[in-house]
Every structure is written in C-alpha cells, then in structure tokens.
Amino acid sequence: MKKSNLHHIRNIGIIAHIDAGKTTVTERILYYTGRSHKIGEVHDGEAIMDWMADEQERGITITSAVTTCQWKENEIQLIDTPGHVDFTMEVERSLRVLDGAVGVFCAVGGVEPQSETVWHQADKYHVPKLAFINKLDRIGADFFGTVEMIRQRLHAVPLILQLPVGAEDHFSGIIDLLTMKQYKWNDDTLGATFSMDDIHADDIDKAEEYREKLIETVAEADDDIMDAYLSETPISPQSLVEGIRRATISLKLVPILCGSALKNKGIQPLLDAISWFLPSPEDIPPIKGVHPETNESIECLPKERDPLAALIFKVSMIEGRKLSFVRVYSGTLKSGSEVFNPARNQKEKLSRILRMHANKRERIDSAGPGSIVGVVGLKASSTGETLCSPDHPVLLEKMEFYEPVISVAIEPKTHTDQEKLEQVLDKFLAEDPTLTVRTDDDTGQTILSGMGELHLEIIISRMEREFGTHVNVGKPQVVYRESIENEIEATAVFDKEVAGQNHFGEVSLRLKPLARGTGNLFKSQLASETIPAVYIPVIEKGVMESLESGTLMGYPVVDVEATLTGGSYRESAGTELAYKVSASMACKDALSKGHPYLLDPIMNVEVTVPESFMGEVIGDLSSRSGKIESISPHVGTQVIKATVPLARMFGYSTSLRSATQGRGTFTMRFSHFDRS
C-alpha cells in the first residue's frame, strides 16, 4: 500500500442499527478496494471484520474492528462498529477518534432506534456524515420515505446525490445527479465493474428535477455556490463537489447515497463520496488539551514534527496479550520509544506498533498524525487516557462511559476455574469500561454487571472459549442506584492501635441530596487548623469509596454532596489510615440516617406493531409502569415510544409476541435513573 500524506487520509466509521447491512457494506468496501480477495458474507459467518467466534455464530458485530484500505489516491482507515444497543459504548469510543462517518440505513426499516442513538453520538463529537440507504432490492423498500425519516428523526438536512433505478426486485442501478449518468453493475464480476450510461428517457425529467433541488440545497448551505446560483453562472461539477464538501464538513448537509450492498450495487460511488466529501485530519479543528499541572490550554496540530499527542480509545486482549488502539493527533509514535501518560503520571515504553486489519496485524516502525494503530507494550495505560511526549505533557479530554444496568451472579464450577476467574475478569475489565465486578458481601458471590443481557452473555461465552473458565450463572438482576432524601450530619472517630502504632482521626460530614444526574460532589468547609490540609484528599477518598456501596442494598450512591464540616487532630497519632476510615464511617452513618431510597434504571422502549394490536400493547406497557411518550405511523405499522423501568421489562419479548401474534418488535436502551 502506497504511503499517503495527511490530505489523502480518511478516518471513518460505519454506523447503523443492527441488521441495516453495515458489515455487508464494509465487506464490499474491502473487496472493491482490493483489501480482501473474497467477499465475506455475514449470513455465512465469514465476514472479515466479524472475526470473533461469537460474532460469526450470531451474525452480529460485537466489537469495533479496524482496517485500512486504499481507494484511488486516498487511504481510508475504517472502523466497523456494532449495531446492537448493548454495545453502544463500542460505537461511542470509536466516534471519539473518527473524522467522518457513514450511516447505513435499511430502505425498509428506515431510521431505527439504534440508528438515532449512534447518529446523535456522532453529532456530540461534531462528526461529518454521509448516509447510505441500503437494501433497495428488498420488498417494501422506500428510498424517499427513508430520506424523510432522516430529515425528521435525525434533524439533518439530507442532500440527495443519487436516485434508485427501479425498486424491490426490479432495482437495477442508480442515477448519479452530479454526473447525470446512470450506473449499472455487472453481476458476472460481483459488481466489480459497472457501466455509466445516459439516463433513460423515462427518468430524465425526474433526474433534472432532483438535480435542480440538489443545487438549491447546496446553495443555501454554501456562499460560493449561492453566488454562482444567483448570478446564473454555470456551476461546474468540480465546483459543486467542492461546495458539497464544505457544507458536509461544516455539518450543514448530509449527502444521501443509495444501493444494495448484498447485491453488489452502489459501493464504488460511496467510496468516491467518502473521498470527496468527508474530511481529512487537516480539515477538522485541531484537538485541544490542557497542561496536566498548569491547566493551560494546548492546541495539538496535525504535524509530524510537533510533540506527540495521542488517545487510547480501546483496549483488547488478543491471544492473551494487551493491545491498545491509539489515534495519533499530533507528532509521531515510534516503535521502541518512551511515552508519557499524564493521567497516571507515568512513563511507558512502546514495544511494537501495528497496522490493523480486523484481527490480523502488520508491524510498522512509526505512526504520524491521523493514524489509527494498535500498540503493544503499554502496561498501566487504559481506555480514554492520553499518550504524549515526556517533555511536552498534554492531557486530552477523557471519555465518558455508560453506567451498567443489569447484573448476574457467577460462581466458578471447579477449583481450577476459581483460580483463573479473578485473572480472567481483570482482562475483561481492562478491555471493557462498561463492565463492573464486585463481591456480594452477604453471599460472597461475584456480581458481573453490564449494559444488557446480550453483553453479559458474550462475556461469559468468551470466558469459556478464550480462557477455558467455566461458571454457573444466576438470573439477570437489575442494577439499581441509591440516594438520600434528607440532609444529615454525622461524626465518626477512629482511635485504635494497629500493628503497634496509634491511629487517630475524627471527621464530621454533612450529606445532602442533589438534583438528579448531578453526580457526587465533595467539598471542605473546615477551619484551616482543625485538620492538617494534607489529610483532606484522604478524607475525600474515604467518602467517595464509601459512596460506591450504599447502606440500603449495597448499590452505588448517586447525586449526593458530602461536605467536610469538622473533626479533630491528635499530633502524635493522626494518620492517613485513621482519617480515611473515619470519613468512611461518618459517610455510612449519614447515609443510613438520610432516608435512603432506590433509583431504577429507566429505559427508552420503542415498540413497532400493526395498528390492530395497539390497544393491547399500550395497556401492557402501562401495566409495567410505562409512560407513553409518543405514537407515530411508520410503513403500515405504529411506533410506540415509552419509558419503562428496566425491572418491569423482563419477559417482555414473550409477552409482545403473544399479544401481537409474533408481529410486534421492540428495542430498548438505557435512558436515566429515577424513582419508579
């Protein structure tokens, strides 16, 4: 593969709802760019990017896979992301490091719930996007209906660049509104070759109508095209492409393309659109960080000779070894070099740098700005942390991770499994920041918590497949949160001899409830001489660790402000241990007296049903303490949006099948914690 300069790099992700055809689009991209020499089909369990055994068995993407391919003069670094709601965090951390994205939409299903979620995640990171309307060969395909859903549900301004020729079984190609040519793919070459012909006479009026709409839409978003349009100056295809590029990168427009990946139609023009309209690392604003000590703002420019600034966005355990996935923003990563992690105030040494192709790896000596690579040798660093030059420290913004909402109790089946379990779980925790593990104080069982039942199923399956660790698994349980109703004060004293040394600490705290979603806060109102300042961080640590397990049922405590109001110090016996323990004791005492209560995980539920079953479905949701948010029509069905406590959703799929004679479907994703 020839070396690309920065201008010719495209870092993109493929994002979509499950079953929109995202991985099939990716497999065709790999085939037509020459990165693979055989088309891998998802339904055959042969997709290159779905390399894990669980992905191949289930026919879904579970983990984001990275690869690099060449299209004409451009190098495309591509991440294929999961579509299932349980793996939303995989999408989130990929979008953090991408410069552009392709949203894949099923022409039958349109904009589905997880499509909305990942699209808005991309909006959060200001990622320019294209939309590819897939599966136009399917019965019920509706190109214009899907475009309208993109406008309405995603609050985007769609720019139609292509029109489908035919529909469903008669879908035969596309009309390109930029070149005003009709594309037809050769089935004998698996779509590798295609013809560009004049538009059929029956379609020319429609094509001219939509080309005029295209120019008007671009003119509204780009001043240069508007000036040419108003002065009636002819707009060349190149000028139009440049205007669309500017409007796409500035997030004003979303170019719309179409095809059928399974039928090998529409992928080459999509690759052209990625090259023409999505940004290079030079086209996006420089990422900003701060100096870890002075908090001074630092701008990281995409220049090879500048100091290093890179972000670890993912960690994987492959063949028992830790592989860190890194996006380089500034400077150059070099194999064998020393880097600095400012979050841990620690230096690390890179042993190898790898260019990734799914689970295959190619060693390279260095990686410059815009590169997305795998790194071996980082021992302490984890997901969301910065790597920088030791003599030019910079701290990039950390990633935010979602809270787990469901848990299972696991027990090792044999003594051998018991010995391996802790080590295996440590590997998964390093890899997956949405996974948590704790020990139940009453039963001694290990409690594994994650984003959903499928998420936990995959973890347990991987324990057995990859590490030979077998466990008994309990029924899924809801992961609640705790908070308090009342403001309360408490004082605790730790005064003991430990290992021949006297330890003394007295701490007084005031706990008060905060608004939902605020998080936990700590502050000190101590008079300066009451307790030496050196012990304040230790007291804060004791409080925050205490809030990790509430007094009601042992769930994490949220939305509480802890204020250090008093205490005392004994010069001969004041120790960090004493103040940490007394802070924890005071916090626990205040929690128990503050009228603690449980918070339920509340889920956004979207149910799609034939209209004749609406009444029964709404009644069932209401009986589960659900609140109906909206009801809207969609392709011969009704879409019901509601919020429902997760605890009331167990067994819902069976109930829905029964109520709708198997014709209803639903999706569910976490919304927030609240009292139900």
Describe every region a protein language model picked out.
Residues 1-676:
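Structural and coupling elements of P-loop NTPases
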